[in-house]
Amino acid sequence: MRLAFWLYEGTALHGVSRVTNSMKGVHTVYHAPQGDDYITATYTMLERTPEFPKLSISVVRGQDLARGTSRLPGTVEQVDKHYKPELIVVAPSCSTALLQEDLGQMARASGVDQSKIMVYAVNPFRVAENEAAEGLFTELVRRFAAEQPKTEKPSVNLLGFTSLGFHLRSNLTSLRRMLKTLGIEVNVVAPWGAGIDDLKKLPAAWVNIAPFREIGCQAAGYLKEKFGMPSITEAPLGVNATLRWLRAIIAEVNKIGAEKGMAPMAMPELRDFSLDGQSAPSSVPWFARTADMESFSNKRAFVFGDATQVVGVTKFLKDELGMKIIGAGTYLPKQADWVREQLEGYLPGELMVTDKFQEVSAFIEEEMPELVCGTQMERHSCRKLDVPCMVISAPTHIENHLLGYYPFFGFDGADVMADRVYTSAKLGLEKHLIDFFGDAGLEYEAEEPEAFTEPTMSGNGTVASVSSAEAPSEAAVVTATATGELSWTAEAEKMLGKVPFFVRKKVRKNTDNYAREIGEPVVTADVFRKAKEHLGG
């Protein structure tokens, strides 16, 4: 086990709770030590919903273990009496899994009707958040989905939308709007907002839509195997993907409609999908051809996150905005083969597969791309490196659980993504101009140091202050550095300061390498100029 510090995926406990907290009439009881109830704070902090998390902890104490007793039966009984759920899901934590207790036997001792209890005995040491969520949702579908007559009108199920999902409600709204324009009804959204009765009527829909590779695809596969329901698993990320998504839905609906003797469904006018019903549904196709966006054609981008978002965003950046992809990666090793298959021809090298944020940060520092699309961790790393970053995938923070309408799916989502790419990468120029010409009182940067000192910054961020009253010559003013690193004179640092901030670290690194090649122990203004000429800048 590794220290749980900045992990991309949560524990199995986290995955289970994402599913059950999404549903109506379902409550989770964790058999866990005190402290594992941190999960409830995660939902109250991030999930902007009026309901309290549907989670309870059956606390395991050392005193209980010594006595050979368990609080689980009593906790299950209390949950049943107080919350009156239709289903209680009992799950272990990492700690209680070591005890190898029979959760089923203890749950039966509660006296609660066993038809209302589901023991999900996932191995928390081998299964992480996404796999646990996918497994539980699939198990719920297996247990409750029942043969149903098909709806009279074309309808779909939207599978995989869960609590704490990335831009969950906005994405759901975007899909609902497009389906309404097509004249297709939504039969069930699950697990988000679904109850047990909703799971039972899943087979009534004509088509299943499961846009997330991480959760929903297995359930869609089961429904296809058991009830013969077709499914669409592509995520509508970007204009091109959205058009393919719409055509795929129409094709599947028309197949079933033909069997029923219905007239075929046609693609509506594209303007019908727009917010005002009059203009183009997305501004990306023309905006990508403007002078502003054409300047992005040579900008280098790196994408990292879960499988669904990485594939969709990478294709969007390259195919629709014309950006250069220097690399992509995912923290989900079990989805890596699928990501490689989807991104064949898009990547210059191997797909990065790692769950260590330090490795991702090191790659970003080495390559210094003009834009990083990543998770909350990449946002932190890029802030330190002065690299533009936009969050496109979980894990996220409060900034990505907004009250407003900010989808990533559909035509509306394409506009949101294009806006964020533009503002993330373009505003860097504004910061550089302020650095170069002065802030004109805008106080863009932190306050200047006191007037009597002249700070200089070394390559490793160490500051050496020189009094203006005794400012020595350039040759004497050398920044303090760690052992083995090159020193820079004040004038060289001043020249480096005129380089745009988003490539400044890379220029420093290249200049250091050049100075070592020519045997210069100190980077002076002259060495800096020579390095610039040598490197073609």
From Swiss-Prot:
Source organism, top-level taxon: Bacteria
Catalytic activity from the UniProt record: chlorophyllide a + oxidized 2[4Fe-4S]-[ferredoxin] + 2 ADP + 2 phosphate = protochlorophyllide a + reduced 2[4Fe-4S]-[ferredoxin] + 2 ATP + 2 H2O
Cofactor(s) in the UniProt record: [4Fe-4S] cluster
Gene Ontology molecular function terms on file: 4 iron, 4 sulfur cluster binding; ATP binding; metal ion binding; oxidoreductase activity, acting on iron-sulfur proteins as donors; oxidoreductase activity, acting on the CH-CH group of donors, iron-sulfur protein as acceptor
Keyword Metal-binding on entry: yes
CDD domains given in the database record: Pchlide_reductase_B (cd01981)
One Pfam family in the UniProt entry: PCP_red
Residues given in the record as substrate binding sites: 428-429
Gene Ontology annotations of biological process type: light-independent bacteriochlorophyll biosynthetic process; photosynthesis, dark reaction
Pathway entry: Porphyrin-containing compound metabolism; bacteriochlorophyll biosynthesis (light-independent)
UniProt family annotation: Belongs to the ChlB/BchB/BchZ family.
NCBIfam families documented for this protein: DPOR_BchB, PRK02910.1-3
Subunit and partners: Protochlorophyllide reductase is composed of three subunits; BchL, BchN and BchB. Forms a heterotetramer of two BchB and two BchN subunits.
Record protein name field: Light-independent protochlorophyllide reductase subunit B
Lineage: Bacteria, Pseudomonadati, Chlorobiota, Chlorobiia, Chlorobiales
